[in-house]
Design a protein with these regions (language model features):
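Helix-turn-helix
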Residues: 4, 8, 12-45, 49
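Hydrophobic alpha-helical connector segments
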Residues: 63-90, 144-147
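Short secondary-structure transition hinges
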Residues: 85-122
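C-terminal peripheral helix-coil segments that are non-catalytic and often amphipathic
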Residues: 75, 79, 86, 119, ...
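Secondary-structure edge/capping motif, primarily at the C-terminal ends of alpha-helices
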Residues: 65, 69, 95-101, 154, ...
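Amphipathic, non-transmembrane alpha-helical scaffold segments
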Residues: 51, 55, 107-118, 144, ...
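Short, basic, alpha-helical segments at the C-terminal edge of helix-turn-helix-like DNA-binding modules
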Residues: 22, 52-59
């Protein structure tokens, strides 16, 4: 029943964003709200369940990228930034900025996923500088701070919706900008 509740929750989220109700979730799959509460304490608990799964999937995919010795530091950074989980396919990321307002505690869980990725990228950036793949003049903490801010900007503002851009497209653009700059 848990997967059905999550599936219904995702469908309602994609229609209504964070303003969805557990009533609409229960109606969608023809169960009582009481049944939902047997599996989840609240709407935020369902978000947390999804984010925990996303975090685990990201961690596994990041580890696979980082342990692939055939990839350069730049390719690893690009891989970390553009890796996709099932949730990018299933969730409408254009509505995520509303979650920051509606459920700030849950949003902080999403920020933790961003921070874990930035930590891995920082290590690869430092390694790339050491190996001569990146300019030695790069200020690592500033670069990571800019990257983190850019990712959070995507998640906290309606930019994806305003520019009619998918999250994966935005992350590819960020990766290209970070690794290749904006000059022609």
């Amino acid at each position: 029943m848990r997967p059905e509740i999550v599936d219904s929750f995702v469908e309602e989220y994609n229609l209504h964003g964070p303003k969805l109700t557990l009533d609409s979730v229960s109606t969608r799959i023809h169960i009582s709200k009481k049944t939902i509460y047997r599996f989840f304490r609240s709407k935020d608990d369902i978000y947390s369940f999804i984010l925990a799964d996303m975090k685990e999937e990201f961690a596994g995919k990041r580890e696979a990228i980082l342990s692939n010795h055939q990839l350069s530091c730049g390719e690893k950074i690009e891989g970390i930034l553009t890796v996709k989980t099932q949730w990018e396919e299933r969730l409408d990321f254009k509505k995520v900025h509303l979650l920051a307002l509606d459920s700030p505690v849950v949003f902080e869980e999403a920020v933790a996923i961003v921070d874990a990725a930035c930590s891995n990228i920082k290590k690869e950036l430092e390694k790339g500088i050491e190996e001569g793949a990146f300019l030695s003049s790069i200020h690592v903490d500033l670069t990571i701070g800019c990257l983190r801010s850019a990712i959070l900007y995507l998640l906290q503002t309606p930019i994806l919706d305003q520019d009619n851009m998918g999250y994966d497209e935005a992350m590819k653009s960020l990766a290209q900008t970070l690794l290749h700059g904006i000059a022609r």
